Amino acid sequence: MNILITALEQSLIMLPLILGMYISYRILKITDLTVDGTYVLGAAVFARTIPFGLFHALIFAIIAGGINGSIVSFMQRNKRINGLIAGILANFMLYSVNLQIMQRPNISVLGMPTLLSILDLDNWLVPLILINSFIIVIVLILLKGNLGLFLRAFGFNKDLLIDLGKPAELYRMLGLSISNGLAALTGTLSAQVNGFADINMGYGVALVGIGAIIIGRQIFLNNINNFNALKEIFACFIGILFYFISLSILLHIGIDPINLKLILGIVLFISLSSVKREDL
């Protein structure tokens, strides 16, 4: 039971980032690896601005993530730089930016106000459920509205969107800004739960996000072809929950933590290699 609760809590921390990656990876069809750095950016901005108040720090972090997404969009504009390369380049630069913000590799936020202390609760499960419920509603409204339709059109056929007289690059910017804003929000949640922001805390989260999206679709949407926003979001949750349950089980049975990423990498490789190319 403890394994499930721990996995559920970790999944809820990561879910905003997974939903953000879903928007970039599945909706826009852009493999945006920038979230590795944006995740740290959110935690860094939160840790530095928390003296101004909890909600101010959350807003500053999300805005910082959104700005980073718009910069990455500008780098990709009119095929100036390949999306994958743009993400790698952005991460390369973000390392210095995050260090400049933090002024040191690690910042403690212990003793600072958090969602847990504001709500006067004993564990993180309830605050995480509340904030994720709010985010899911927002993402559902987005995906079911005109903006969601145009974002999907961008991913399906950008040239068709241009032929219809729509500002395709604007939708790229909006999609990547929302995606990176959600990644930054996850960084703030992680900093609050763990009690610190660290310059290396984002290593590999983009790959975990892509793996969770694909695994969730294989488990829950394997034979479903029609787009259903609620089912897509639920599949993202199933995917990240499966990942953290697997992680908890491996630790519980005594697997050396040094080998965890190797084993989980093999699992992700098998999952990715078994998916049709058009579903990647």
Swiss-Prot record:
Membrane-topology descriptor: Multi-pass membrane protein
Pfam families: BPD_transp_2 (PF02653)
Localization, UniProt: Cell membrane
Keywords carried by this UniProt record: Cell membrane, Membrane, Transmembrane, Transmembrane helix
The organism's place on the tree of life at top rank: Bacteria
Keyword hit for Membrane: yes
Signal peptide limits: none
Stated name of the protein: Uncharacterized protein RP368
Single GO MF descriptor: transmembrane transporter activity
Record field: transmembrane: 3-23, 52-72, 81-101, 123-143, 196-216, 233-253
Record-level GO cellular component terms: plasma membrane
InterPro entries, alphabetized: ABC_transp_permease
